[in-house]
């Protein structure tokens, strides 16, 4: 966290997700051995993290804050976005940064008439519903959903 920036009318929050190749047991083979640019999924995960945490900072807070979530290990079967969001919330909560958290997030899928909590990539491909909810003890902070044609009652139940 830096000192407050003068002359800006927004909260300068930067969220980065670093997906390291060593997390899945690979070492880049190029001459420079660099990790490269973030993937589209990493960019979408950064946005997923930013949306629910941004409103939990105090109004008028102008200090620049950078949040970097680094993948240390991955089984390549479980999406990392929910884990990263919960990790960021935990880190901000225990830091000295003024943050009105914590918040918790989960993803729900719906396969064969049953809800699946934090489904794998394979289960998400079969799922009729993909809904992510992030909330604090006071209420929902962010909800993101994607679905095929599905009954409204199922969405409400999720």
What is each stretch, according to the model?
Residues 1-65, 71-78, 137, 144:
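Glycine-rich, flexible beta-strand/loop modules in the N-terminal catalytic cores of phosphate-handling
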Residues 96-158:
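Mobile "lid/hinge" segments at catalytic clefts and subdomain interfaces of large enzymes
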């Amino acid at each position: 966290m830096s000192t407050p920036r003068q002359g800006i009318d927004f909260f300068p929050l930067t969220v980065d997700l670093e997906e390291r190749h060593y997390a899945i047991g690979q070492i880049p083979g190029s001459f420079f051995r660099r990790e490269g640019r973030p993937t589209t999924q990493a960019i979408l995960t950064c946005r997923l993290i930013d949306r629910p945490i941004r409103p939990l900072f105090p109004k008028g807070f102008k200090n620049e804050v950078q949040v970097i979530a680094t993948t240390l290990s991955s089984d390549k079967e479980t999406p990392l976005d929910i884990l990263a969001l919960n990790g960021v919330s935990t880190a901000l909560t225990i830091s000295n940064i003024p943050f009105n958290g914590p918040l918790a997030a989960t993803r729900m899928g719906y396969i064969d008439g049953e809800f699946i909590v934090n489904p794998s990539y394979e289960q998400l491909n079969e799922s009729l519903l993909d809904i992510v909810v992030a909330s604090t003890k006071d209420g929902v902070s962010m909800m993101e959903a994607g679905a095929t044609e599905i009954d409204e009652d199922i969405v409400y139940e999720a």
